[in-house]
Amino acid sequence: MAEPALLPAAQMERLAPGPLASPCPRIPRARIARRCAQRWADLGCSSGPSSGRMDQLPQKNLLRLHPAGSAGCSTGVESSSMDGFWMEVEQIQQRDELREEDSGGNEGQLPEEGEAESQWLQDTGLSGLLGGLGLDGDHQELLSTLTQTQVAAVCRRLDIYARSVRRQHKTPVRDVRDVFGVFNSGKMSSENGDSGMKGAQLSSGASKFPPAAEPGGLQEQAGREEAFNMDSAYSEQAAVLLQRSRPSRGGTSAWGKCSLPKFTVPKGRLGVTRIGDLSLQDMRKVPSLALIELTALCDILGLDLKRSKAGKWKAAETRLFGVPLDSLLEADHKVLPSTQVPLVLQALLSCLEKRGLDMEGILRVPGSQARVKGLEQKLERDFYAGLFSWDEVHHNDASDLLKRFIRKLPTPLLTAEYLPAFAVVPNIPNLKQRLQVLHLLILILPEPNRNALKALLEFLRKVVAREQHNKMTLRNVSTVMAPNLFLHQGRPPKLPKGKEKQLAEGAAEVVQIMVHYQDLLWTVASFLVAQVRKLNDSSSRRPQLCDAGLKTWLRRMHADRDKAGDGLEATPKVAKIQVVWPIKDPLKVPLTPSTKVAHVLRQFTEHLSPGSKGQEDSEDMDSLLLHHRSMESANILLYEVGGNINEHRLDPDAYLLDLYRANPHGEWVLKQNPT
């Protein structure tokens, strides 16, 4: 990622270190956990009744996290303790003036029956299917790209929505109590009624939380390299796995640095596509496709991922803290048009990288509450004016500012709609399937949230890389940062009694997986890129629907797709590469099965710098010119433009012949890297 672009400081303000604020009275961690048992139930997604004995939250003598050694696994005490999580919750409650009963409007509430399915169809671009309106061109194009499991997920949502509509319009049957009245017995209703209601609440609460993945199994996989297949849809892989064998009862815990296996994405003939390699027009199609695939995958895994409602937020009077990410970026674009991450977040991360990476306990040790509040006010007043100086900001204060910035966002960084989906990931028994669900969730996130999250995760990975100096293991970092990502605005979560430890560990595990596997998670799966190509190809052709039946139309589309591979045109022997700069003539490259994108880039570099020594009298001028051209050619990339893709930055290991067959009507263009 490019270095953060910070605002120039017009004047340097000296920040005199103030006296440390007197510590607040410590709150017993067991009491914090009980207070946290009021709001996290909304983060659990129902998939079945919980089973097995739940570990009780430690009431006394909680073990403190201690720095682990520079090598090897975390100790048993460290791997079983969540003390860092509850210490962070305690500090949040001490520093932020929380209102325990304030639920923030309707944020976190689950939609009513049928409403979730209606919203899902709108998010996936299939809202026209509601009410039997039929299929227009856009719906035809999208449905033609779906796999069988994805089509089944769409049909399932349509059926649920149709049933809810019929139920709403059905005339209710008259209750016999409306005719003859109700026998009133206060004593009976108070004794039996209350107990029955409590029993119903307990049973429904227990069914909301699926059995968590049990530890064990990963230690045997430690150090083993395993392939992470992105060529076929995850839901199709899960369906095949479900047919071949029974799902494993014991899960795989991701805790411990040594217990995380290494997953590698096999590079196919078309290469690997990262987030950012696709144009904005193509990338806008990915979230809806990823949402359909996520729903199909969760249907097969037996997870009910209900989308929560986004709460209403009041417009903040501040300019930095408590401001939506898109509003921050809108203001930042006036200063730096190319920025994709809020400048204040970049500045905070840059300050911590320069001053805090090697400091012991970074992110865990709190700063001065008085200084942090003063720094927040100075940032609000002086940041955009370029008058704020980071030179004397203590690294612990900067750490608190970073976490405070994340917590005070009007909506969670992981979004209010899909925060429950992130929280349910640890309940998936198989680690690879957890990664698949997380991968799709990352692709669904709005672009500002995804970019800000990536900047944060890159910084956290740098902290873990300096573990020998700062004594912060991957587990330490995850337990400290999890409350700031999952406790929106620092509010204690609601969850059933006895579930605190389970969900706290789950939240920290999600952060750990995102930090460790972020390169994999920020990849656009090959099957999604193929669906984008088909969607663009269908959009350009705009086939007319002759039969109104959905199944008939899908059958015809699949038949046409099978016939399309029989009439391939003759493959040219030479590929013409358009060059935007610095030459105008196209570059001719032999199109063979072994020609890679890297060969084109190497040939272009040799074309700019042929390596001739030249005459001695112009040696200095030629050497400077060749050096300049070599520097420029190092930033040259090959793009695929037109055809069934708008613009696609190609992987150097991709093969040209396979790219031509995937997009015969596209062009290849050499351009400078925009960054």
UniProtKB/Swiss-Prot annotation:
Residues 95-118, 187-218 are annotated as: Disordered. Residues 323-522 form the Rho-GAP domain. PROSITE patterns: RHOGAP (PS50238). The record marks R364 as: Arginine finger. InterPro entries: Rho_GTPase_activation_prot, RhoGAP_dom. One of its GO terms (molecular function) is GTPase activator activity. It comes from the Eukaryota. Disulfide bonds: none annotated. Pfam families: RhoGAP (PF00620), Ubiquitin_RHG40_C (PF25442). Keywords: GTPase activation. GO terms for cellular component: cytoplasm; cytosol. Residues 103-116 have a biased composition (Acidic residues). GO terms for biological process: regulation of actin filament polymerization; regulation of small GTPase mediated signal transduction; signal transduction. PANTHER family: RHO GTPASE ACTIVATING PROTEIN 18,19-RELATED (PTHR14963), RHO GTPASE-ACTIVATING PROTEIN 40 (PTHR14963:SF4). GTPase activator for the Rho-type GTPases by converting them to an inactive GDP-bound state. This is Rho GTPase-activating protein 40. The lineage of its organism: Eukaryota, Metazoa, Chordata, Craniata, Vertebrata.
